[in-house]
Amino acid sequence: MPISALDSFRWIKTMKIKLFGGLRQKAETAELDGSGATIREILHQISADHAELGEALFANGSSDLRPHIRIMVNGLDSELIGGLDPAVGVDDQIAIFPPIAGG
């Protein structure tokens, strides 16, 4: 029996994205399921599903991440591994941090 395109989408694996600080309130959860080949694709997918979170992550509806938002992949800042365009897989751990200030 051939597999339809719809059936093949059921096998796409998702990964867990952890949210911190005020981003949790925007998404109304501390953890989201996301899918995509790159960090950027995942961020756009979760932003499409959670509009308030998308507004907090991206400036004026653009694809530019707001300053001071930190994306960590397996404990490393995404800026150290090539920004938002490196490939990620289901075994990678992604965490998103809002700006943090202290004093």
Each predicted region: which residue ranges?
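Ubiquitin-like/PB1-type beta-grasp interaction modules and other compact soluble beta-rich domains
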Residues: P2-G102
